[in-house]
Amino acid sequence: GRCCHPACGKNYSC
């Protein structure tokens, strides 16, 4: 899955 917001930190992916 994608994590598309700033709170994801290093996991941010769009």
From Swiss-Prot:
Its main location: secreted. The keyword Cell inner membrane does not apply. One of its GO terms (molecular function) is ion channel regulator activity. It comes from the Eukaryota. Disulfide bonds join C3-C8, C4-C14. Keywords: Acetylcholine receptor inhibiting toxin, Amidation, Disulfide bond, Ion channel impairing toxin, Neurotoxin, Postsynaptic neurotoxin, Secreted, Toxin. Amidated; synthetic peptide with a C-terminus free is 6-fold less active than the amidated peptide. Belongs to the conotoxin A superfamily. Alpha-conotoxins act on postsynaptic membranes, they bind to the nicotinic acetylcholine receptors (nAChR) and thus inhibit them. Specifically blocks mammalian nAChR at the alpha-1/delta binding site. Shows very low potency in blocking the alpha-1/gamma binding site. This is Alpha-conotoxin MI. It comes from Conus magus (Magical cone).
